[in-house]
């Protein structure tokens, strides 16, 4: 792989990680702000508490379906915005 492609690839991976981390951090903060436990979310979704624990880890790559389910339990809607980058 050329240096340029490798650099672009690393940048893309970093952006992917940043999006995941930001999304999960926001859901966790909101859950905690409501005083809702991981167990309460797990019970409502019919999954184990460790599943929610994994979901809330920054390196976890959740499905959109799971994000929507967790958000729904917190009384949130999910909206995804695509914003044109300035560094095209």
Model-derived regions, located:
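DNA major-groove recognition helix of helix-turn-helix/homeodomain DNA-binding modules
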Residues: 65-80
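Short, charged recognition helix plus adjacent turn
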Residues: 80-88
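Short amphipathic helical patch at the helix-1/turn junction of helix-turn-helix
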Residues: 20-21, 32-33, 61
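Short basic helix-loop element that most often maps to the first helix and adjoining turn
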Residues: 25-44, 69
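Recognition helix of helix-turn-helix/homeodomain-like DNA-binding domains
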Residues: 45-61
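N-terminal flexible/basic segments that precede or flank functional cores
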Residues: 1-26, 88
């Amino acid at each position: 792989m050329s240096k340029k492609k490798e650099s672009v690839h690393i940048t893309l991976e970093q952006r992917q990680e940043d999006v995941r981390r930001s999304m999960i951090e926001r859901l966790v903060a909101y859950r905690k702000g409501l005083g809702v436990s991981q167990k309460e979310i797990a019970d409502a979704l019919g999954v184990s508490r460790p599943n929610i624990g994994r979901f809330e880890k920054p390196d976890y790559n959740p499905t959109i379906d799971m994000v929507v389910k967790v958000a729904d339990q917190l009384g949130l809607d999910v909206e995804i915005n695509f914003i044109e980058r300035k560094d095209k």
